[in-house]
Amino acid sequence: MAHGKSAFFTTDAFVAISVLVVVFSIVVPLPTQILDALMAFNLIFNLLILLMVLFVEKPTDFSVFPSLLLTSTVFGLGLNVSSTRLILTLGDRFSGYMIRAFSSFVVGGSGTQGLVIGFTVFIILIAVQAFVITKGATRIAEVAARFTLDFNATKSMSIDAEYNAGVITEEEARERKRQIQREADFFGAMDGASKFVSGNVKIGIFITIVNVIAGLIVGVIFRREGFQAALQTYTNLTIGDGLLAQLPSLLLSVATGFIVTRSSDQGSFGQNVQEQFSKSALVYFIGSGALIVMAVLPGFPHSILFFMAVCFAFVGLQLRKRERVHVQEHEMQKSSDKKGMQQTQDSTSEMGPIVPLDPLSLELGYGLIPLVDKEKGAELLSRITVIRKDAALDLGLVAPKIRIIDNMRLDPSSYCFKIQGLEVARGKLRLGWFLAIKSGQVTEEVPGERTIDPTFGLPAVWISEENRDRAERVGYTVVAPSAIIATHLTQVIRTNAADILGRQNVQMIIDALRKEYPAVVDDVTQKCPLGKIQKVLQGLLREQVSIRNTVAIFETLADFASTSDTVPVPILIEKVRQRLGRQICLQYADEQNVLHVMRLDSSLETFLSEKIALTVDSLSILTLSLDEQRQVLQAVRTVFVPTRQEGYIPVLLTTDTIRSAMWNLFFSDRIEIAVMSYKEVSTDMRIETVGVVRIEESDVDAFVRKQ
């Protein structure tokens, strides 16, 4: 606590006292010694602000700048008032060193010549500030504020779209929205604060004119001085005061201009200048040649121009050497890669008897390599890391590391996902373009190349960046190429989670659980071999049921499994699903805990329950003829499709006897319908029946007669 109080009194209290001093300096008379100190502080303080602006990486990193601009402006005006009071009060007895120094040493002359020089310098400073720096900075601040505020809604919608697509996490979405708010606050404040700078320039002219006129009145009328002497004294001091006031103001104007003209480039101003001025050696050679041509012309300063030409040529030579080194390094890298490939090809005889396959891999055409190029941001790599974390949280499955391979046999703009070396999905991208997906109500078509979203098969359009905002406004969901692959990867992991979960993964789950729940693990491993545990977990994942609640799953297996290994896997899966019933219900229920369900007609349900059989790999199936399958599936579609169009995503609710077999029937026909049993529905869930699946009685009777 002591440390916190100390920090408070050395920062917040100091700032508060400083602001009060600034305000009171306007009305409280100051001794000349204090005035000198404050003027020197004002000069160095504005210089520090300028240096801070030059070294920040982006404008919002210096978010206190608008407040500092106001404080510095008021402080400078307070010093103007105090110095005017002292000059008019003391006249030629004024002993302020800072103003005297600027009125004599900085001006570079004395007498009438010094006045003319000082007045000229003062006018030039005023003109530069008023018509060049301040006017430009004010205009840029206005435009930046307007565009920032106009695009806030669009940026927020884009962030929401990426979050809903699973591309970014909730924390990343919040941070991006906070950054948008910071930018809006900063540029909105700068729009108003820039008016302080322009107003400061105008008031400087006014104060100078008033000081000269008031000085002549005081000197000639009240002090009985001669007109020439009064003009010399007060004009000299006024110009010194004006120059001393305008120099900090000029520094502040330059800082304002710099901070509102900074682009989105990363790095400080100096780093950006160095990087962008060192891209081409040819520029410096051309500049050197131009200087040599000027040097040989009559009347030009030959030695200075030749010296500058040599300097430019030297810089060009250094850049050319660096370019050659980069080219050599690049060639060496390519040679090393080729040599490595040759060594790989030549060393096949030394390879072991087994070449393991990657559990999950992403192969890219060479045109998509920039997406994983670390020198260009490698945005896709960071997204993949987030996806693996989300898979662990959503499904309870720790996805394996994803190997990324450049496949020269792929189309340059294509990519594909493989699990254990077998392709499971592929897509095609256009780098530099955005995919506008018709995910909802679209009010207007946008120009572009018509295509299909590779993840969900929705109609989409490839659009240019200039049409991105328009597409978002009319209802499209717009995603970047890296986000497309990331979303596709998320879907691949979800739909193929059962194939990704190997026995080694299951053993890792068991080992991790043993550390905190050794009794549960010992009980289940005594009754269930590793292979059966794997099949149960795969059965859950195959139907998108999270296995994160591993303790509940293992306890259920321990309760219902048998050491004689006689309990079939489908039975164990049903028992585990019943234990996880509330979790499954929440997965499909709406916000009011209402589960929208389809039911089977009782006669159809009875008929199907008599058709259950187990395959050799322990899958529960329905032994129906092709005609019977067709009629059952058509009856389900008749209820499911209209209900889906009304906005519901219903599940099929049936008995636990045929639940698994019905899901396998849908899966074999690529119908994505969740199937639950009555025993899985928790007591606090409300069930709303949206339709009954039935077949005409004559058809059911025909089925029975065939038996």
From Swiss-Prot:
Q: Which Pfam families has this protein been placed in?
A: FHIPEP
Q: What InterPro entries does this protein map onto? A: FHIPEP_1, FHIPEP_3, FHIPEP_4, FlhA, T3SS_FHIPEP
The transmembrane residues are 8-28, 34-54, 62-82, 114-134, 202-222, 239-259, 290-310
Q: Where in the cell is it found?
A: Cell membrane
Q: Where is this region: Disordered?
A: 329-350
Q: Which GO terms describe its cellular component?
A: plasma membrane
| Function in brief | Involved in the export of flagellum proteins.
Protein name per Swiss-Prot or TrEMBL: Flagellar biosynthesis protein FlhA
